[in-house]
Amino acid sequence: LSVMKKNMPEIREYLKIKADYLGYQNGLPWFELYAPVVEDDEEYSFEKGSQFVIDQFNTFSKHLGDFATHAIKNHWADVYPRENKVGGAFCENIRSLKQSRFLFNYGNHFSDVITVAHDFGHGFHVRCLGDQTILNTHYPMPIGETASNFCETIVGKGALKSATPTQKIVILENTLSNAIQVICD
């Protein structure tokens, strides 16, 4: 909490700048909190996006990259939106099989690539718990979100290395929006 409190002035400054950019003089309305400031014009097919995630994971840990590769090759992910499919994304862990299943509503944007990294982070976290007893595998949300947010950071930092100026704005805005979501939750 101390790190969040310490960085709140920067978050507030970002929100003031965003409000001004979007034309609001009296602060940013809640409904504009996650409004994009630039369009994400880069297309990331699931194949391209998931391979990018794997490549970035491998720069940190071959085990992490292998986990993501295994999940994709074994069709552990329900990737695309379709009629009557629930929205959002999540990771469901199947303890008895020592496996995870992933639900995405992948839309070919950078934010979808980050969502894949995030949820693979949840799955990898559970994989690392391995043969722990059930009592050791229940944890509070801040611990549960640590691995997933860390995986987002790995992929985001990797993406910045080769991004165009517009893509850099998309990546940084996505990072800030995710940080704001954590703070608001």
Predicted segments, located by residue:
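Contiguous, non-catalytic segments that form substrate-binding/exosite surfaces or channel walls
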Residues: 1-101
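Active-site-adjacent bridging/hinge elements
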Residues: 27-28, 89-99, 119-130, 165-166
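Conserved helix-loop functional segments at active or binding sites
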Residues: 59-66, 92, 122, 126-133, ...
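Acidic/His metal-coordination segments adjacent to aromatic residues that form catalytic metal sites
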Residues: 96-104, 129-139, 169-171
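Active-site recognition of the HExxH zinc-binding catalytic motif
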Residues: 107-127, 148
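An active-site-proximal "capping" alpha-helix that borders the catalytic cofactor pocket
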Residues: 120, 143-156
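Active-site metal-coordination segments of metallo-dependent hydrolases
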Residues: 135-147, 178-182
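Long, amphipathic alpha-helical stalk/connector segments used for oligomerization, subunit docking
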Residues: 157-185
